[in-house]
Regions:
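Electrostatic cytochrome c docking/interface patches
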Residues: 21-43, 81
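Bacterial N-terminal signal peptides
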Residues: 7-16
Length: 142
């Protein structure tokens, strides 16, 4: 009888531990409000400013919660010999990247998210990404 109780207790403990482990790995999905595909400024305000800040300096209200400070988006050109790295920015937005300042890739990969907004017109995803990149270019320090 005692052996049976021990087996039951161990099984219950193991099941509880597995259940807890599954919960800690659960991903949280946050709905994204749809913005105009032509407005890089609106997309930036809705999707980027919470971490990167209104002016792109990396000082948004959510920045303190990240493992590493967000990238200062105003110095992208400066850090690329004075030329805005459009192709790199488009690739990061589309596919994500291992960016040291993001720690464990905390920045969302926006390509799939933006693509879901206009399933009937997949071209709009690229238009959105391109317009967001163009807006980031306007934030560059002079």
């Amino acid at each position: 009888m005692l052996k049976r109780l021990i087996v039951i207790a161990m099984t219950a403990t193991l099941a509880a531990g597995m259940s807890y482990a599954d919960q800690s790995k659960a991903k949280v999905t946050i709905p994204v409000n749809k913005t105009a595909a032509t407005s890089g400024k609106q997309m930036y305000a809705n999707y980027c400013a919470s971490c990167h800040g209104v002016n792109g300096k990396g000082d948004g209200p959510a920045a303190a919660a990240l493992k590493m400070p967000p990238t200062d988006l105003t110095v992208l050109s400066k850090n690329n010999n004075g030329k805005f790295p459009d192709a790199h920015i488009v690739a990061v937005l589309q596919y994500g990247a291992e960016i040291p300042s993001h720690g464990s890739a905390e920045m969302p990969v926006w390509g799939p998210i933006l693509g879901k907004m206009d399933k009937a017109n997949p071209e709009l995803k690229q238009i959105r990404i391109s317009n967001l990149s163009r807006y980031l270019e306007t934030l560059q320090a002079k």
